[in-house]
């Protein structure tokens, strides 16, 4: 169980670094926000998942 908790914590730390490169690339494209907002929102969705997962796993580790 500890490995799962450590993996979830790592994911919750590592995944937010992806938009650091992705979001400026979307805004630098010729179409800008109008064509790239789906990319930004789909990139933000996986960032939400590890947060409750870490909470659930943390409550089960004593």
Curated annotation (Swiss-Prot):
GO cellular component: chloroplast thylakoid membrane; photosystem II reaction center
Any Gene Ontology biological process: photosystem II stabilization
Membrane topology: Multi-pass membrane protein
Record keywords: Chloroplast, Membrane, Photosynthesis, Photosystem II, Plastid, Reaction center, Thylakoid, Transmembrane, Transmembrane helix
Alphabetical list of PANTHER family matching this protein: PHOTOSYSTEM II REACTION CENTER PROTEIN Z
Similarity-based family: Belongs to the PsbZ family.
Assembly mode: PSII is composed of 1 copy each of membrane proteins PsbA, PsbB, PsbC, PsbD, PsbE, PsbF, PsbH, PsbI, PsbJ, PsbK, PsbL, PsbM, PsbT, PsbY, PsbZ, Psb30/Ycf12, at least 3 peripheral proteins of the oxygen-evolving complex and a large number of cofactors. It forms dimeric complexes.
Name this polypeptide is given: Photosystem II reaction center protein Z
Source species of the chain: Selaginella uncinata (Blue spike-moss)
Gene for this chain: psbZ
